[in-house]
């Protein structure tokens, strides 16, 4: 409370922020997700926009994908955070599931999950829990994530990683293993970030959407379309 009061008293008048949010905030989000020395940041292959929590980031991403791939089907894990289905259905997508949890082992059923991904049509959107799977808490190993990345590449799938609990499993950097593997793959993908839990700012709706592209030029085009989506939300 003391720190908040000091910042409020010292703050200059508030002007308009960019549509995509404060540059410093978006840069910090990228450094946290991808690492400060990330090649995709250095090459301008990622764009980030501030969002109203992870929910807002998911919805902005869903609306953008709907403009680009309107006939896609979205696949979420079985089980998944209940709002995943509601968000993508509200954006106009049919939503199906891929197998994820094995109640006998109380762990992830990676074999069944990857087999399902390898059967999906190109252009399908795959919502993935980057760490701390909700509601099971069962995460994939690094080797299993590598197989997921390979399946997405082979089938031409659209990965959408939901990072709501970075730092709550094994630490900030270890929890980014899925993001790092996708970054190294050369694929385009989406990442929704929520910092409500990480920063204990539950009432502030602190989130972001990051989109990894194929080039700096493509990033500029994606950012232009992303701004249009944000302005209409």
Task: Describe the predicted segments one by one.
Residues 1-7:
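Phosphate-/polyanion-interacting regions in eukaryotic proteins
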Residues 11-17, 188, 193:
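Generic detector of contiguous secondary-structure segments
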Residues 12-156, 166-168, 172-183:
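Conserved core of the PLP fold type I
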């Amino acid at each position: 409370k003391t720190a908040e009061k000091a910042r409020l008293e010292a703050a200059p008048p508030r002007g308009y922020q960019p549509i995509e949010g404060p540059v410093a905030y978006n840069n910090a989000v990228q450094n946290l997700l991808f690492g400060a020395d990330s090649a995709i940041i250095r090459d301008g292959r990622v764009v980030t926009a501030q969002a109203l929590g992870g929910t807002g980031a998911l919805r902005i991403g869903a609306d953008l994908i709907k403009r680009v791939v309107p006939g896609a089907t979205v696949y979420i894990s079985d089980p998944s955070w209940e709002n995943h289905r509601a968000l993508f259905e509200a954006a106009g997508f049919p939503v199906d599931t891929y197998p994820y949890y094995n109640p006998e082992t109380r762990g992830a059923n990676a074999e069944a999950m990857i087999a399902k991904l390898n059967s999906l049509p190109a252009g399908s959107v795959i919502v993935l829990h980057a760490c701390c799977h909700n509601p099971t808490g069962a995460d994939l190993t690094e080797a299993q994530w590598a197989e997921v990345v390979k399946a997405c590449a082979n089938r031409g799938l659209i990965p959408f990683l939901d990072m709501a609990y970075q730092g709550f499993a094994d630490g900030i950097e270890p929890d980014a293993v899925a993001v790092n593997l996708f970054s190294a793959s050369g694929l385009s993908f989406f990442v929704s970030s929520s910092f409500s839990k990480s920063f204990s700012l539950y009432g502030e709706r602190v989130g972001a959407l990051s989109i990894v592209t194929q080039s700096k030029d493509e990033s500029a085009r994606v950012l232009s379309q992303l701004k249009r989506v944000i302005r209409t939300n």
